Amino acid sequence: MADTSLSPVLPLFANTPSSVSFKKLRKRLVRGALEVIDTYGLVDRRAIETGEKPHPKWLVCLSGGKDSYGLLAVLLDLQWQGALPVDLIACNLDQGQPGFPKHILPEWLTQNGVTHKIITEDTYSIVTDKVPEGRTYCSMCSRLRRGILYRVAREEGCEAIVLGHHRDDALATFMMNLIHGGRLAAMPPKLLNDDGDVQVFRPLITAAEDDLAKFAEAMEFPIIPCNLCGSQDGLQRVVMNRMLDEWERKKPGTRQVMAKALTNVRPSHLHDPRVFDFAGLMLGGKGEDDPNVPF
């Protein structure tokens, strides 16, 4: 794993707190992201360093929320330390929401010397027109946004779209799929699109949302609230997060244990013949007993 000792000269961090707690927080987020990058092969650092492959380009999605700001800051930090040999392009999709402060992100990105692209597409009108009253906008909004970002990634020559989803997003998605979808699935750290030409990366997928909130406050990011999906009542994701909050209150550390479970899967102890050959289990073969399963 590459060295992630912190340098004080990255412009984005020039005026950040000098407290030990902030330094630990920053280091925790940076090292966590680097571990995800290395574990799931988001970049072939060795091949790039030896010249076998050119520097890839990543399209880093910036919504103006705390998570995407944190994502960009962490990636820039890794890039600055020489641990991420990737060209980064920050991208904001202006979806035409009424009252959206168009000046904030371009000014902040320019001030911090970040290469960026602002895309304007009025998906707001489409979503509010097509989605029936009382239904949530999330699904259609996400599909439209994803299609636009794939297109921009291709136009910019980017091999990957990078998103700021974190551990708590993954757990809420897992619970939604479990309870409402009848399947075991969360958010993958690395995904290939249907056309096979653009990847989706989530380097913060092991980061705690609380850490990102503290980081955003310390960094004084100019947060832009979502006035579409984020303002609707009755979102199932909100319900799942409340459920997880309650479990965390009753048993601190529950979220981290659940996140660990996503990396510790035993297909032989589930019921899906597509991922485990139950029919092929024969006497005399290698067994897989589990003392934690009631007999």
UniProtKB/Swiss-Prot annotation:
Transmembrane regions: none
Keyword check for Transmembrane: no
Motif PP-loop motif, residue numbers: 63-68
EC numbers on record: 2.8.1.-
Coiled-coil segments: none
Pfam families: ATP_bind_3
GO biological-process terms attached to the record: tRNA thio-modification
SUPFAM superfamilies the UniProt entry points to: Adenine nucleotide alpha hydrolases-like
Sites where the protein binds [4Fe-4S] cluster: 138, 141, 229
Protein's pathway: tRNA modification
Required co-factors: Mg(2+); [4Fe-4S] cluster
Miscellaneous note of the record: The thiolation reaction likely consists of two steps: a first activation step by ATP to form an adenylated intermediate of the target base of tRNA, and a second nucleophilic substitution step of the sulfur (S) atom supplied by the hydrosulfide attached to the Fe-S cluster.
Protein family: Belongs to the TtcA family.
Name the record gives this protein: tRNA-cytidine(32) 2-sulfurtransferase
